[in-house]
Amino acid sequence: MTVRGAALAPDPASPTTAAASPSISVIPEGSPTAMEQPVFLMTTAAQAISGFFVWTALLITCHQIYMHLRCYSCPNEQRYIVRILFIVPIYAFDSWLSLLFFTNDQYYVYFGTVRDCYEALVIYNFLSLCYEYLGGESSIMSEIRGKPIESSCMYGTCCLWGKTYSIGFLRFCKQATLQFCVVKPLMAVSTVVLQAFGKYRDGDFDVTSGYLYVTIIYNISVSLALYALFLFYFATRELLSPYSPVLKFFMVKSVIFLSFWQGMLLAILEKCGAIPKIHSARVSVGEGTVAAGYQDFIICVEMFFAALALRHAFTYKVYADKRVDAQGRCAPMKSISSSLKETMNPHDIVQDAIHNFSPAYQQYTQQSTLEPGPTWRGGAHGLSRSHSLSGARDNEKTLLLSSDDEF
């Protein structure tokens, strides 16, 4: 039996007893109270709704990835596209698992770590895809080199007044995205370590908590990466116009940046007391973890709409058309497993990091060139200039640039 502090109605027949008796109430143990009622995140309805959106998004995106691998006619572009598309399964499934286990801080942190690490790769791969669309660094520089940077407070280029586009500008864009690929995994590992030592709790901005410092470093890093991505788009938006970059850019930036601002908004609501903690005989969850649980639920729903938008933004149909030549014959394709293996190989990311952080970068840059090959039937929409002749073989040549051309 549990004793609660609610008043018990006095017995009219026993005034003396009523006056002497304390104001208590006896409630059978296990009876529900206001604090023990499960919040929406703990209900079967929340798990079912989020699960429906997640598994639908998985089916849509996995089919799209399969079709890209099946029509793997332009590996240099589709490698980046498939990596970008994987953000939906990873974000959706990880968020769903985090939601299912959000009352357990250990599981919750691990699932969120995997999701956050892949976020960094998506920004880098989208920038690399834009490079590939335009034919490589040298082709981009031949178009924009020496042009003055338009100063605009709206577009965040007011601090670049008087500067011109140079090879240093491209280097900054790549380095700013690559640093996020390093910082984000380091912050994820730090989160796991701090969690193990009891020094990390979601939403705890105390100076003795690791959450404050991880959040500051992460926010600076992701803001720099997204700023560099925007600067590159601002400089090459006219060159990218044949490839419908607006929807692609919007989707990649919204998936990553929207989740970031959602987390910030939920953290503010938590500090304002709008998100209560869960405390019952069975489980006790802090306000920060509850806020993160709500964000996981929102992401589960959002990934369904992201899957639909990404299916349109990165269509496989243009690559399917490139499989067929003028005589209607299909060009031989790699197996799906070998195409997936090539896509998931991080060798190009490592080489690009070495190339962009090398002291010799200001003297050399690489340009993809093609040897003439048979022309296949199909539109050029979504394909890079350097790949307008499908079936050609990629070669790398080095182009010497002036060493004093800095951004």
Curated annotation (Swiss-Prot):
Membrane topology recorded in Swiss-Prot or TrEMBL: Multi-pass membrane protein
Transmembrane segments: 40-60, 84-104, 121-141, 178-198, 214-234, 249-269, 290-310
Region (Disordered): 1-24, 369-395
Superkingdom to which the source organism belongs: Eukaryota
Compartment(s) of residence: Membrane
Entry GO terms, CC: membrane
Disulfide-linked positions: none
GO molecular function: transmembrane transporter activity
Keyword Transmembrane helix: yes
Keywords: Membrane, Phosphoprotein, Transmembrane, Transmembrane helix
Modified residues (Phosphoserine): S388, S402, S403
One Pfam family it belongs to: Solute_trans_a
InterPro entries per UniProt: Ostalpha/TMEM184C
Assigned protein family: Belongs to the TMEM184 family.
Known role: May activate the MAP kinase signaling pathway.
Protein name: Transmembrane protein 184B
Source organism: Bos taurus
Gene from which this protein is expressed: TMEM184B
